[in-house]
Amino acid sequence: GHNLLGAGVCAAACALKADMESRGIHGTIRVYGCPADEIMSGKIVMNNRGVFNDLDTAVTWHPFDRNRVSNDIWQAQDIKNYIFHGISAHASRSPEDGRSALDAAELMNIGVNYLREHVPGDVRMHYAYADNGQPANVVPDYARTNYFIRSSRRSRTDDASLRVDNWAKGAAVMTVTSVVIELVSSCKEMK
């Protein structure tokens, strides 16, 4: 649905312009493209740089299965990369010399799946393997997972995010690897 954002907002601006002209209303309509929608940081950067300072109003939209004004609560969210570093080795000749970064990432993700039962019902933890290293016959020395950690309250997101961090650190200890935790973006809930 995100491919509809630009086309939809341009159509709305054209319709608004026609309506304003037909009623003799003077004003300026500006359309902004807001990058990084999925990581919720584009509008923050634009706001911090003063892009919206002289606006009387701002209207945004997002594709949905029905057309309505939303009064939804937008969740607090952390987006993080968990980057595991290990030691590469040949998987059939000397696997004992390797320390698998991919094993660490998998153990972390398994742990987080067990964690889901022990967090409030509105907490969501989504992940994807972003980079898993080398061919199957090589113990991978690098793996990266990307996480979205969300909740309707910032305090719950903070708690879940810390717990996910601890799973990552524990997985690194279990596999004798190391982990770098990279915060990509973070935002509070919006009501």
Cite the ranges covered by each PLM segment.
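Generic structural signal marking isolated hydrophobic packing positions
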Residues: 2, 21, 180-184
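Histidine/acidic-residue-rich, glycine-tolerant segments that coordinate divalent metal ions
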Residues: 3-4, 16, 20-140
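Metal-dependent amide/peptide-bond hydrolase catalytic core
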Residues: 102, 106-191
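Short glycine-rich or small-residue beta-strand-to-loop segments that form or flank ligand, phosphate
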Residues: 1, 32, 148-150
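Alpha-helical transmembrane segments that form the membrane-embedded catalytic/substrate-binding core
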Residues: 5-9
